[in-house]
Amino acid sequence: MPNLFVIAGPNGAGKTTYVRDFLPQEMRCREFVNADLIAAGLSPFAAEKASFEAGRIMLRRLRDLAARREDFSFETTLSGRAYAPLFRELRAAGYFIQLDFLWIPHLDITRNRVRQRVTKGGHNIPDDVQLRRFHLGVRNLAELYRPLLDHWRLFDNTGDHPHLVAQEKSGTIEIVDVPHLAIIEQSASVRFVSDSPAITAEEAPAFTPDEVTRRSLRAMRRAYARVVLENKAWGLPVIQWRDGIGVVEVPPEQLEPFARRILEVDGDPLPADEERALLSHLKI
């Protein structure tokens, strides 16, 4: 069965960074299509003006890959509804569709991350576009795309350790982090479990991640640590969210120990050879 991996989330959520670790290393998928990168190629100094043409090129490329029944992936904010017909076509053709949504709790995080990306030579997304897209993605996941997916997962990608909030596979939903899901539902004015009472934290079952989820979280940690170390090399802070505080900046001089904390798994450090390779990979 061929696979489609969709990586979704607001601008600045870390989608492309996650993809670079997750797809080739953990899922052995080499085909990745990104409309923002296409737009940047069409118009390097004003990529937003090429977004419509980039979207057309992207959809054409996706259908070409599907016609060859290849495994492939693409990135999206999921703020539009145009992918629904494509998902229906692919499921009818026998594709297994998995979507990972990387959630960000506050628009200020995305704005600051996009500004940093521009500083490092990446593409810009205008503030008004970020604002329009911010809540639409998770709302469309809950209200439009859920029944078109075989497996979706909702991750919080802002704290020291990215973690799974909820997932649904083959129609069975599993809520892993009840308080975070409640925050997401309230902020986006949406319900993922609309036909049953809200689950309390005490009622949530114990969660044991499967192998694919462990791979995803491992890739997210590696990807986040890379960004942290890249920011250190550029002399930039890391923008993140801390419960009870809000948006905070971790200054450059604190970023190497911060990267080490990210790589720890339940208090266990990354194997020494992997840590050395990661901590020494940036030469700017």
Regions found by a protein language model. Give the residues of each.
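Conserved glycine(s) of the Walker
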Residues: 14
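Glycine-rich phosphate-binding loop used to anchor ATP phosphates in small-molecule kinases
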Residues: 50-104, 134-137, 153
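N-terminus-biased detector of the onset of the functional/mature region
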Residues: 195-284
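A glycine- and Lys/Arg-enriched "phosphate-lid" helix/loop adjacent to the NTP-binding pocket
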Residues: 95-144, 195
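Short hydrophobic/aromatic beta-strand immediately N-terminal to the Walker A/P-loop
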Residues: 5-6
